[in-house]
A protein has these predicted regions:
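Nucleotide-sugar donor-binding/catalytic module of glycosyltransferases
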Residues: 1-205
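C-terminal subregions of glycosyltransferases and related glycan-biosynthesis enzymes
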Residues: 165, 170, 193-293
Length: 293
């Protein structure tokens, strides 16, 4: 769990973590130089529970870097990430560990709750959730959130080090899809708290845009495609990703046509996260003749 100035909801989340029914767990809490009482709260828990390892960042490093510190410190064969303001159901880890099978990563549905903890719906009400069996599923996006994941150690070498310009859960999911795939578990196992200080909210279609111009947007997409191509194991999927990165870097008609043909050929995989019909995802690929998205 990564913490930063989260004392308002922290005790409730830590209590839910320590109450997990799975028999053998270690808890790694990494505080990112909080200025509130978060660190003191964690120290009090660590003094009472030998399963807790507490790491203190001397200076603030940000959420992504803090999660990487925690992952590198983990000793278990499977790892789960926790936000500081949610509440886990007691059976979360046990059910996911039992269901992960040969997959590299499994993620659950989440219940949405308001700032007071009252459940208001499901994450799947706003987002299409599905399996991601191969790397091409991550070309345009994904709806697998980090707080709902359980993943195997086998993905760490592909996923780390994290890049600051993409989400940590995105690259973890991509690494898993590149190896033995990502499995969706439809049961809600986390109360995902929605409030004004969320880093990412439940409706991913309304996320903050990290660009101001089309040129800047295109440059970010190329950078992301180059990253995942470099992390993808050798094979046909890696070559497709490299080709897309080259084509997205150019605005020429030839490049737009090439990326359209590539996406049209692989539209089921690349647009799986949108939950469109087969025809709908095919027609969506025509947009690439005009723009990136």
């Amino acid at each position: 769990m990564a913490t930063y100035n989260g004392d308002k909801y922290l005790r409730e989340q830590v209590d839910s973590l320590l109450a997990q029914s799975y028999a053998t767990l270690e808890f790694i809490f990494v505080d990112d130089a909080s200025s509130d009482s978060s660190l003191a709260i964690l120290k009090a828990y660590a003094a009472k529970d030998s399963r807790i390892q507490l790491i203190e960042n001397s200076v603030n490093q940000g959420l992504i870097a803090t999660f990487e510190i925690g992952i590198r410190a983990a000793k278990g064969e499977m790892i789960a990430l926790s936000d500081q303001d949610d509440v886990w159901l007691p059976e979360k880890i046990g059910l996911l560990a039992a269901a992960i099978g040969p997959y590299s990563l499994i993620y659950a549905n989440s219940a949405l709750s308001n700032a007071s903890g009252e459940v208001t719906g499901k994450y799947s009400d706003r987002n299409h959730l599905c399996d991601y069996p191969n790397a091409l599923n991550y070309v345009f996006g994904t709806k697998a959130m980090g707080h709902a994941m359980l993943f195997k150690r086998e993905i760490i070498d592909l996923a780390l080090p994290f890049a600051e310009f993409v989400g940590h859960d995105y690259i973890l999911g991509f690494a898993a899809a590149s190896l033995n795939g990502v499995r969706y578990f439809p049961q809600t196992l986390v109360n995902y708290r929605q409030h004004n200080w969320n880093t990412v909210g439940a409706d991913l279609s309304k996320g903050k845009k990290n660009y101001t111009t089309r040129k800047e947007r295109n440059a970010r997409i190329v950078k992301r495609l180059e990253l995942i191509a470099s992390r993808c194991p050798a094979g046909s999927e890696r070559e497709i990703l490299k080709k897309l990165a080259r084509n997205f870097a150019s605005t020429s008609l030839m490049s737009r046509t090439s990326r359209f043909l590539t996406v049209a050929k692989h539209h089921r995989a690349m647009l799986a996260y949108k939950g469109k019909s087969d025809l709908g995802s095919f027609l969506y690929s025509f947009k690439l003749l005009i723009s990136i998205f």
